[in-house]
């Protein structure tokens, strides 16, 4: 945690709105610009003599900016760019111990407070050493004599962390407990063991505070927000169409597993999290948004939408997302009256080849009246083609001037131009050096990366151990599905190879691509600048690996592309599709008058930081309207964040006797039934986006795939027993590279048969007779369920399949009224989100 969090720079505005509810600012602006948290650790001991001059003894006084006692300048302690005055240890004693008159009870006190005029806060534990405070070896320190001495452990931190103290209190309490145990183990002789205490701070406390202060958390939209529900179903359909291929089993199984075991808040004795590993943040964030739409607790307050101006795209530039005004004068309206352009395609049915031209090169739209969602479709003169084999190297590139060697296996190598690198100046080719064969479209998921996987897999039942038939859902979905592709310009359609395209790549047109026996790549023929561009793009979904939507029709396989891009070609119906072009267009558009798809989600009308929502502006505006003199008649203002409290402001009225009354404020509290609904919490749950490394303090996250990730997760699960004080900690581990799902469980067990003084037991667990047992089990792999499938999970998977099919039928039927469709979609989503095992 020494480095600052940097992850928002690679996200577009639409992804930020989906994940965070607003266009989050770049890293640094929201974290205060602090590279690290500076602290001061102070351990003091107080004896029982009130009149003694040597009443206090300093055991440890350490500062992160130097060595020894503070190690700073003598007159200041620096916190980032803000200088805080230096506070002597004698002055801190007064804040730590307070009055010298003690209470009769010998209790442990945990407290925190801000030191006036110092921009610092104190976190303190004051305790009496007693025999229940065992050390690390489960025994009491030697030569210890019970006395009235009081020991204090104090952490001095910058005051800007005040809002994060309460959120991190479980981790702070765990750090204080571990520090107390280490202190008892040393018999209060800390000079030789100072590094141990500093290590505890750097491993347990500082990472927890920085995680709460710097890493943005997901905003879980209200469960009845129709714009969010439309966006959620679109992402689900896009995922199924572009990522599932012929076996529609991965996502339904993952949703069912999440609903049953990971949706609700865990019990006090249990702690769980969801971790996604992927090499591409676009794919990972899509899955984070899908799973986050099912988790709890959700925001339950009134939402106001902030309207921002929309910039008009030009043919020469890419479409830039509208920027957030950030001014206090922003207006708030309902989300149905605002439109912002989007790069998100409508659900599930648009497969496209990478266009070789810059996006939005043409601005002519096709307007089609329909009942579902609108999407901008751009005309083009480019003709499509379909193929049943892999892509070949363009033969027209062959020349004698230069050559590039590609490995000569029995299979073809893929050279694909990523959409994220489309440019008219310099676009290198991206080489997929994995072995491809004609079994590509029939092999199991992840076979590109596992050379040991041979043979082909048929469309068998993915949940072969007693679960519902996924193949039925697959064929049913494909029947109702609308498949189309955006393809590049090709003079000859229906051929198995590309003709020579336009030379807009920035490469030498005389480069020859030939098959040789060498293993060299394209890199040695490129300039250093072009080699830099070959690195994986954060905006391309091909970087993970393209899951081809294979079909058994004569038309062959289709190539899915990123759902984050909108091409400039006209969609063409695939061979073997079950709908004509009119039905295709009608099934993926709404009945908006302008006929253009608009991203349904907008900026929510309140500020937020990384960990919480800020309703200061809305509350201030509400109270200003209450107390201002000139008030509109019968004006109603709804306070945020609580949707169950409404403030009604009535203007001056005359009663029956002609007496004019002053404006009155009536607060109506809606109490459903006999239970009072909870106020929406400002603090957001610990769910976050794609991070550069595993963070054990978050319950939902996506990270890059590494070899050590499972060990890090197990280590994070063991830390839960310190901070959360739980008995079971488990993680749902999702690997996008191998399309597998694992469950990692660490459980605390009590050893009954083993004596407490046994030598083969962990010394830390001798006094309590407990030990930790870990288990890693694979629950889903190669498109099938590999573990034991319970009837509860089987029923939930079938329910998710039926719900997705019902939603798909509503979106694909152009005759359904928009209002009726919204009502039905809302009921379907609520049925999925509130799936109850006991009611099935």
UniProtKB/Swiss-Prot annotation:
GO cellular component terms given for this protein: FNIP-folliculin RagC/D GAP; vacuolar membrane
Keyword hit for Transport: yes
Pfam families: Longin_2
Gene Ontology BP, a term: positive regulation of TORC1 signaling
dDENN FNIP1/2-type domain ranges (all copies): 731-836
Biased composition annotated in UniProt, kind: Low complexity: 323-338
Keywords: Amino-acid transport, Protein transport, Transport
Record domain cDENN FNIP1/2-type: where: 231-723
An annotated Gene Ontology molecular function: GTPase activator activity
Domain annotation uDENN FNIP1/2-type: ranges: 34-223
Family indicated by similarity: Belongs to the LST4 family.
Record's protein name: Protein LST4
Provenance organism: Candida glabrata (strain ATCC 2001 / BCRC 20586 / JCM 3761 / NBRC 0622 / NRRL Y-65 / CBS 138) (Yeast)
């Amino acid at each position: 945690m020494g480095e600052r969090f940097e992850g928002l720079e690679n996200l577009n505005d639409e992804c930020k709105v989906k994940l965070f509810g607003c266009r989050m600012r770049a890293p640094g602006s929201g974290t205060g610009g602090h590279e690290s948290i500076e602290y001061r650790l102070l351990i003091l001991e107080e004896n029982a003599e009130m009149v003694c001059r040597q009443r206090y003894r300093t055991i440890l006084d350490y500062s992160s900016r130097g060595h020894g006692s503070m190690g700073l300048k003598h007159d200041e302690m620096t916190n980032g760019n803000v200088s805080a005055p230096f506070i002597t240890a004698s002055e801190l004693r007064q804040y730590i111990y307070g009055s010298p008159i003690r209470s009769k009870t010998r209790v442990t006190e945990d407290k925190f407070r801000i030191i006036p005029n110092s921009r610092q806060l104190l976190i303190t534990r004051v305790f009496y050493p007693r025999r229940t405070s065992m050390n690390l070896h489960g025994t009491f320190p030697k030569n210890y004599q019970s006395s009235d001495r009081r020991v204090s452990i104090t952490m001095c931190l910058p005051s800007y962390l005040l809002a994060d103290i309460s959120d991190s209190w479980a981790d702070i309490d765990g750090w204080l407990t571990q520090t107390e145990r280490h202190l008892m183990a040393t018999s209060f002789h800390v000079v030789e063991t100072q590094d141990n205490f500093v290590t505890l701070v750097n491993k347990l406390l500082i990472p927890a505070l920085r995680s709460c202060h710097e890493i943005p958390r997901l905003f879980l939209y209200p469960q009845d927000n129709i714009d969010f529900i439309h966006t959620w179903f679109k992402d689900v359909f896009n995922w199924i169409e572009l990522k599932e291929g012929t076996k529609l089993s991965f996502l339904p199984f993952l949703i069912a597993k999440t609903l049953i075991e990971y949706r609700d808040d865990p019990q006090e004795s249990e702690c769980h999290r969801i971790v996604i590993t992927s090499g591409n943040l676009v794919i990972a964030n899509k899955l984070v948004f899908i799973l986050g739409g099912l988790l709890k607790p959700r925001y339950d307050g009134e939402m106001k939408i902030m309207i921002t101006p929309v910039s008009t795209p030009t043919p020469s530039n890419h479409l830039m997302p509208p920027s957030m005004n950030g001014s206090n004068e922003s207006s708030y309206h309902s989300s149905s009256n605002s439109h912002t352009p989007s790069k998100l395609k409508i659900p599930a049915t648009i497969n496209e080849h990478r266009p070789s031209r810059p996006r939005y090169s043409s601005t002519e739209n096709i307007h089609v009246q329909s009942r579902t969602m609108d999407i901008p479709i751009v005309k083009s003169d480019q003709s499509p083609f379909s193929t049943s084999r892999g892509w070949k190297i363009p033969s027209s590139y062959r020349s004698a001037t230069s050559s590039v060697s590609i490995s000569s296996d029995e299979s073809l190598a893929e050279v694909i131009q990523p959409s994220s690198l489309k440019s008219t100046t310099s676009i290198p080719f991206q080489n997929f050096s994995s072995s491809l064969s004609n079994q590509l479209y029939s092999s199991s998921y992840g076979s590109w990366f596992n050379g040991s996987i041979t043979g082909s897999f048929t469309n068998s039942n993915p949940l072969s151990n007693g679960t519902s038939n996924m193949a039925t859902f697959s064929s049913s979905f494909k029947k109702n599905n609308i498949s189309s592709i955006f393809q590049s310009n090709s003079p000859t359609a229906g051929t198995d190879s590309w003709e020579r395209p336009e030379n807009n790549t920035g490469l030498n047109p005389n480069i020859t691509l030939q098959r040789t026996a060498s293993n060299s790549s394209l890199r040695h023929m490129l300039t250093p600048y072009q080699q830099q561009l070959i690195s994986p793009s954060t905006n391309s979904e091909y970087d993970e690996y393209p899951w081809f939507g294979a079909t058994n029709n004569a038309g062959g396989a289709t190539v899915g592309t990123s759902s984050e891009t909108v091409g400039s070609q006209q969609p063409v119906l695939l061979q073997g599709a079950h709908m004509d072009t009119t039905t295709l267009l009608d099934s993926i558009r709404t009945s908006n008058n302008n006929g253009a798809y608009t991203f349904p989600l907008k900026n929510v009308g309140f500020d937020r930081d990384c960990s919480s929502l800020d309703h200061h502006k809305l509350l201030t505006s509400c109270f200003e309207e209450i107390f201002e003199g000139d008030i509109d008649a019968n004006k109603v203002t709804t306070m945020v964040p609580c949707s169950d409290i409404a403030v009604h402001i009535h203007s001056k009225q005359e009663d029956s006797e002609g007496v004019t009354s002053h404006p009155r404020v009536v607060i109506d509290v809606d109490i459903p039934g006999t239970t009072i609904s909870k106020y929406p919490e400002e603090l957001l749950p610990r769910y976050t986006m794609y991070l550069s490394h595993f963070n054990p303090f978050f319950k939902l996250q996506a990270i890059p795939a590494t070899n050590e990730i499972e060990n890090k997760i197990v280590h994070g699960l063991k830390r839960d027993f310190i901070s959360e004080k739980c008995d079971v900690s488990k993680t749902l581990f999702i690997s996008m590279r191998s399309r597998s799902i694992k469950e990692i469980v660490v459980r605390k067990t009590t050893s009954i048969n083993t004596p407490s003084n046994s030598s083969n037991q962990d010394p830390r667990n001798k006094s309590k007779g407990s030990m930790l047992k870990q288990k890693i089990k694979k629950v889903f792999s190669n498109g099938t369920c590999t573990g034991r499938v319970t009837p509860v999970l089987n029923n939930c998977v079938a329910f998710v399949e039926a719900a997705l099919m019902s939603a798909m039928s509503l979106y694909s039927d152009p005759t359904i009224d928009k209002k009726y469709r919204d009502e039905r979609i809302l009921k379907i989503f609520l049925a999925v989100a509130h799936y109850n095992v006991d009611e099935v």
